[in-house]
Structures are given as structure tokens and as C-alpha cells.
């Protein structure tokens, strides 16, 4: 190739890359402008902090989902893991286990449940969709068995535990801080470590990754465990906020998480996408929920609007890549 | 059908791909279209069949100016294009494949299977193909799939068939079958445009040849009036003194040895060794079990029985990770499928097996990674504007170099190359050969599987011939001839 051709090729690739990175940001920006014009109180600091608190749960789950989707997989069981681990954590607290220890144990339980997904998918050679659809059902069922279908209450007045879901630190909601911390750690993991690079490689071409000496099974099991752990952490926040564990907690949370990942520009076929995008996707969904509430739109219409926004985002993404 | 393309120009963005190409096809001729990758052969054919529109230039068919707006229209007018990647739906039957998009149905919209079967049968008979119409196309060999495509083209009454690298994945027997079919088609007045990198085939089957270089026609001539060296010279625009660069091997100790290895159904009782600085060529017919052997040695598949010895020590390779740890590299026969992350940058591709070497504290040192990758890009002369270019946008030769680069990065002791120059143009081929020689000078042991006999003869120090899953002979390079290898490969003594 001639140098001139090479330069235009380089420019084009650069331009495409920039567009792909900026797309979700632009979407969020436009959305914020529209909402704040319709209702200026959206931009009040109190509302913004409130929004950050609201999105923390979906954020944590969606971060884990990003890793899963980058490998070309999907995890439908995250909402069910949230429910089961929450119920177990609440049960432990009621029976006298120290709440902080209970949260840590809950995260471990979440990781183990995620690991079961990972093993079914790798060792059991099952399609991720099917495997996690099945475990979702099992985990949901176990939650109902354990709670007997009733909320678990009487979680006491432990200060640390209450802070976790409802507290503020330096005026910022603790769940938002948790989410941001998790984001930073996961961003480093995805973009700065061999583990992250291998995640992309598996999604890009699993056979080539295997032949390049990547421990595909191990990486995948770790990723599903991570998704489970983050779901359990989100569950702990929810339990603290509601001061109880609900047997049907986290229903359809997997769909919000997948929507956030997709809005963030991550390809469902794996190998392409960024966790920053997911954060933006989470904020877009959060802004929609929050903004539509402020505008007094009924929750029935909110669903319609949310769905349409997702469709538009994906359509625009298609156009760009075509 | 007579086709005349005159002064065709085409740019993609700012890339001038074709600048004044002329091409003429006569009825009933087999016309070779040759050129290095990126010379513009496919673009020219895509313009003819209406996938792309020329910026400038004339196309006339039987004397009338004709421009197709899409490949379907070209097909309806008798021009069929059989691409290198075959258009086969593996889960559908042969019959369904033959009539895809052209199903015959009654007025009520019900498929008329019997009618279609009769037509298909007639066509298969003409080509003397014996294939069950009801079996799944995915169960057919690549050669048979190719016949399905040819039959499909002929059923649309194609008068011109364009074949892009038709023999890339065929066995010797399938190739001679294909040549028989081409000869028969020619007699019936069908013209063939034959795109291939395999010089031997061009001289065996073609009547005329058009050579392209950098988007221009260099020459069109009768095949009988030219020879191998002249064609190569015109293709690359310079003289290639030797196809296979010379080297004086300095052989060391056995670095890799396999004893009595078997995988049920693939190969049996295979034993051979390779010394440092040595190139061992593995020859045999397609399907003889060579690739399966290499996959098992590298731990992709499990060995049922047998031992692997590395540097004089018995060891086991249970998975590719262990193979990499023990200093093995594997360049697979299908780089798009198993070698590359196509939608990922060259940098990340090359870095992949080497990540731990520049991630000292668990974090990737991006500066060291960039230096490492740049060095390899330079060393292997990978032609690219930037290491961030996605692998998909590279030519076949450069893609192959990326795969080789990632393995050179690990500092391999043993390198397994399966069909290292498949789909690679002449210039890049030569660079890959030179690179192999350099590696052996540094003591790397190379096992090279190849279906191209000249390549086996030109590059190997020792040749192992495989026949039906067993090693049927081992020949020293000095004593090897094409005939000797073919005899062993076909089961003779």
C-alpha cells in the first residue's frame, strides 16, 4: 500500500473510533439537556445525588454484565443471584451474624453462584443463554423456598449496615461511592491488566484465544463469578435501603443491566465495547427514570419511552457501523 | 459470451484501486487473472458483476455496452462468480442449496421437489458428480461443495464463471476432477476467469493470462508464450532470483520428539523428531491427518497414546497453555478462524500470547507493549499505517505475518507452521520463507505442514510423508523429488 493510502486508512479508523467512543456520551448529553429544559429542577444538586444513588444497583450489575457480554456471553441470572444472596444475608443478620460479615459472606455466595454459571458454560459446554436461564429459575425458586415467599425483616439497627444503602459520606450517597469505587477497580482490570485483554480476546475469537495459550475456561469462570459477586453487592445495597429482603427482589434487573451495556456501545457478539460506555448507559437509563418521574409521566409510559430510547440508540449504532 | 472491459478506474475513498485496467474474455476460454494480493483482481471482477460501480471505463458484452447494477442481475445475464469463501448453507440439503433463492414452486406456493430433483440430477450427471441430493451440504467435502456451486451456476445458464482461488482447499484428486469439469465446460463454450496464486495450475489449465499489478494491467498473453519466471517477474515488478532463499542449516540437538502418538480416528503410531535449526516438512494429501497431528502435539486435542519429549525430557502437553509455556508456537492453517482477532488491532493481536512479559506488576506496561509490537512490525515488515489498524483490513500476507509475529514474540523453541503461505502472494511468500530461515539460524526448530510440493521441497531439510494417518516415509531433502513424495503420500512404496 502507498503511504498516502495508509494515511487515509489511518484517519478513517481514527474517526470511526472517536465516533464509537463519543456516541453514548453525546446521547447522555442530549438527554440531560432535554430533561433539564423540560424541568430545570433536574439539575439541582440534590436531585443529581439522588440519581446517583438510584443508579448504583443497576450500575454494579451492569459492570459485571459488561465483562460477560465482552466474552460473547450473557447472564440472565444476575437478578436472581441478587435476590437469593440478599435473602441469605438478611437471614444471617436476623440470626445474629455481624451485618458487615454477612455482606462479605453474601458477596462470596454471589461469586459461588456465578461460578456455577461459569462452570456450566465452560465445562458443561452449555450456551450461556440457556445455562443462566436455568440457573435463574433455580435461584428464584430457592429464594422463595428460603423466604417462604415473605419479606425478611427485623434487620436491627446496625449503623454500618444502614449506611451501606442509605447513608451519605461527605454529602455523597454511599451506594454512589461504592459504584464509583467498583467502576475504577473494574476499569483498571479491564483496560490495564492481562486479564482484561484476555476478556476481549475470548469475545473476539475464542479459538484464536485458546491457541494463543489463554486459559479460556478459567477466565470465563472468573468473569461469571465476578458478575455474581457484583450482583450480591448490589443486593446488599438494596437490602440495606429497604431494610428488608424481598423474595421477588431484582426481578428483570438483568434486562436493565443488558440495556445499559448495549446503550454503552458494547457489542452483544463480544470482543468490542468499553466499561465507560456501560457507565454512561446506566446514567442514560437513570436519567430517563428520574427525568420522567420529575415530569410526572406515568410509570406505564415510562416503560414505553425507555424501550424506544434503547431502540433508537441501537439503530444509530447500526447506521454508524454500516 | 465475449466480454470487454476497457480503461476501468475505481477508487475507494482516496484509495485508487484500479487505474486504467483493460480485460478481455473470449467465449470458451479459460483465462487466468493473476496478481499479488491487493493488485485489484477481485475489485475488477466485482465491477464486472455489478457489486461495485466503476468510476470510469467501458464494459461491453457481445459488443453492447452493459453495466449490471448488482450481482443478481449479472447472474441472470449468465455471469456467475464463485467466491473463495463458498456460499454454502451447511445445515441445508444439497438440493436446497442448489435452488436457494430460485426454488421452483407451484401456483399455490408449494415446493415442487420432484421437478427440482430431476433438474439437479441432470446437471450433476453432466458434471459426472455423484452426490446424494438429500444429504446436508455441511457433510460434503470442500471439493464437493465447490461442485455444488458450479452446478448452481450452470443451472442459471451461466456462460461465464469466475472462480476465485477455487483449489485453495481441495485435495489433489478433487483438483484433477475440477480440471476435468473445466475442460468439459470449455468445450460447451463456457468461459472461465480463473483467479489463483498457484502457478502450476495456471499453466496446466489456462489458455490466456492477464497479469495485474498495483491496479493496472501489466500484460495479457497466451499461456504458451510465457513461462513461470516471466509471470512472477511481471507480477511483482522485479526479478525473484530464487523462489526459495538458500540457507546452510546448522543442526543442533533434538528439541522436540514425539513417540508412538495416536489419536483415534485421526492418526496412529506417529513418531518423529526435529532438531534445533532444522525445518521438517510434513507432506501428504489433504485429509491424511497432518493438521490433526499438529493440533494434538500443541495440546488443542488430547493424545490418546504416545509420548512427547522436549529437550530430552519426557513431558506432557495437555492444553495450549502448557505448549506455550514449553516454548511451542502454532501457526494454524486457517488464520482467520484460529489465528487472528479480526476486529482487533495488530498491536493487541501480537501482544496476546506475550502479555505477561510486559505486565510486571499485573498491570500492562503500555509503553513496553508498544515498543515490543513496533519492533516486531518492523522486523517482519508488516505493511500498515499504524499498529492500531484492525487485522481484518490487512492483506493475506500481512495477516499471516501478524500471526507469525505474535509467536516470534514468545521466543519459541519449536514453531509449528500449518500451511504458512496459503492465500499469500508471491512477494510476501518469499518474505515468510526468509523469516523461517532466519529463525532456524537462531536455533528455532520448525515443523512445516504444506500441501504445496514445491514449498516442501524448497524449504525442508527433512521431509515426513503422511498417508492415512500414518507416517509412510521420511526422506532427506537431497534425495527428495515430487514423484517420490507423491508415491509415499498415495500409499505406494
Curated annotation (Swiss-Prot), chain A:
The keyword Transport applies. One of its GO terms (cellular component) is plasma membrane. Coiled coil: none annotated. Keywords: Cell membrane, Membrane, Sugar transport, Transmembrane, Transmembrane helix, Transport. Its main location: membrane. Pfam families: BPD_transp_2. It is found in: Cell membrane. Signal peptide: none annotated. It is a multi-pass membrane protein. The chain crosses the membrane at residues 22-42, 48-70, 77-94, 101-121, 126-146, 169-189, 219-239, 294-314. It comes from the Bacteria. The complex is composed of an ATP-binding protein (RbsA), two transmembrane proteins (RbsC) and a solute-binding protein (RbsB). Belongs to the binding-protein-dependent transport system permease family. AraH/RbsC subfamily. This is Ribose import permease protein RbsC. It comes from Bacillus subtilis (strain 168).
From Swiss-Prot, chain B:
One of its GO terms (cellular component) is plasma membrane. Its EC number is 7.5.2.7. It is an enzyme of class 7 (translocase). The keyword Iron does not apply. SUPFAM superfamilies: P-loop containing nucleoside triphosphate hydrolases. CDD domains: ABC_Carb_Monos_I, ABC_Carb_Monos_II. Residues 3-239, 246-493 form the ABC transporter domain. It is a peripheral membrane protein. It catalyses: D-ribose(out) + ATP + H2O = D-ribose(in) + ADP + phosphate + H(+). Keywords: ATP-binding, Cell membrane, Membrane, Nucleotide-binding, Repeat, Sugar transport, Translocase, Transport. The keyword DNA repair does not apply. It holds the Pfam family ABC_tran. It comes from the Bacteria. It is found in: Cell membrane. GO terms for molecular function: ABC-type D-ribose transporter activity; ATP binding; ATP hydrolysis activity. Part of the ABC transporter complex RbsABC involved in ribose import. Responsible for energy coupling to the transport system. The complex is composed of an ATP-binding protein (RbsA), two transmembrane proteins (RbsC) and a solute-binding protein (RbsB). Belongs to the ABC transporter superfamily. Ribose importer (TC 3.A.1.2.1) family. This is Ribose import ATP-binding protein RbsA. It comes from Bacillus subtilis (strain 168).
